[in-house]
């Protein structure tokens, strides 16, 4: 069983001053799709510095739409959206497992935030959806509605902010908001 960390707080997105490093918009994106299910525009997307920021606005919009559809239809395994040009710091990681999306914003030693529904009856049980394949997540901190997950992800991708559509468990020391 999990519980909310004593250092964590439940907040709305507008109550979180999101540390983003030097940039205010997503610079780097990597996506891992289910084998054989990579959307057309994503097939040749480079894994290089500032790969997302370098896209023409029309291409970014088309790729975001394909990403949204892939998330909704369960064709994405994981995502990494970073404010850092090389994808190393200040990032939103998303892992999909068993019909659940585990999202975690991490600004090393400054902030860690995950969507949170602490009032859910089984909130602090294991979601069996791990971040990075190794960090267990409580049910309170996963999204089970893939349409909502897609909206939260695209909001971050397009606005460089956490979505106001959900509450967030946040720890301003950079530790996980649950223990």
Residue ranges and their predicted role:
Residues 74-106:
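The feature represents the first ordered module of a protein
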């Amino acid at each position: 069983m999990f519980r909310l960390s004593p250092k964590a707080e439940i907040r709305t997105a507008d109550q979180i001053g999101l540390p983003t490093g030097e940039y205010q918009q997503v610079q780097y994106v990597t996506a891992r799709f289910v084998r054989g299910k990579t959307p057309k525009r994503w097939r040749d997307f480079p894994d290089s510095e500032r790969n997302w920021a370098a896209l023409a606005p029309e291409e970014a919009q088309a790729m975001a739409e394909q990403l949204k559809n892939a998330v909704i239809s369960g064709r994405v395994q994981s995502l990494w959206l970073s404010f850092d040009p090389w994808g190393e710091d200040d990032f939103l990681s998303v892992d999909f497992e068993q019909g659940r999306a585990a999202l975690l914003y991490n600004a090393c030693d400054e902030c860690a935030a995950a969507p949170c529904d602490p009032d859910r009856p089984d909130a602090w049980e294991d979601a069996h959806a791990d971040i990075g394949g190794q960090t267990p997540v409580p049910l309170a901190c996963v999204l089970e509605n893939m349409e909502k997950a897609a909206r939260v992800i695209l909001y971050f991708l397009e606005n460089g902010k956490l979505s106001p559509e959900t509450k967030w468990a946040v720890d301003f020391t950079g530790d996980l908001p649950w223990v």
